[in-house]
């Protein structure tokens, strides 16, 4: 084991004081934190690392196929908190949902094949410029959609140079296999599975997306469950440190939770290696690019200040 790695025992020891503080918070009522997990990712991380051992509150897990579904559940109050990429979060926040980002993480190294635009192996499409007049499938407001908009812009193409088809990841996979679409803007594990099956990458997120993901919480959860929520976030940050040197362990749990093949789960873990980062002015400035991209595409009309999208409960 590398000297700078975080063992499960060290992780739990470091979290002991946090759990004790939560226990002494004065909240004697039954406490339940409803956590949304995309394709099992957050749940597998917390279970494999042992980060939730010793908590004095209950965690209820709900699984979602994509960020949009998770954010809709957050907006309705069906879950208290869940992890989502910066693009879908901004899309949802500007739609008026009562949610805020309460902690930030960043893919490390900066994302490449974690978010991609794919074409069939034998497609004549060789570059983003070749997408003019073609059909791209993705989920509206997703990180895949954001990558497509950025890639089109870099290639000198406006958004209406292509036809976007809005599909769930599962439906898109079927459409991609049947060739009813020309390209697919997607993310892991869907991208990893498609690449394994022969899909070809024509664009990735390198230098086009920031790689930020946020734990997003309902405003009522922030107000009523702040101590529990903050404890969960601190434990998650420690779990990310653990995962950086325990990818195979994390992947095994992820495969068990989701049914993904172990090689796909390991690829997903390695391509989405993340670290906790502060919600600071640099991050907010970076996020203005995301907001401006969606605005330029006519997708959103920002009516909420970006600075108010964040509730930095860990730094208060």
Regions found by a protein language model. Name each.
Residues 121-128, 157-158, 220-229:
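Short helix-loop capping/hinge motifs at secondary-structure junctions, enriched
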Residues 3-4, 10-25:
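N-terminal export signals
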Residues 127, 159-163, 263:
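Short acidic capping loops at alpha-helix termini that bridge into adjacent secondary structure
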Residues 72, 76, 90, 129, ...:
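Solvent-exposed, polar/charged alpha-helical surfaces in well-ordered, non-transmembrane soluble domains
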Residues 29-155, 182, 207:
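Short, glycine-/small- and polar/acidic-enriched structural segments
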Residues 41, 224-299:
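Secondary-structure end/capping motifs
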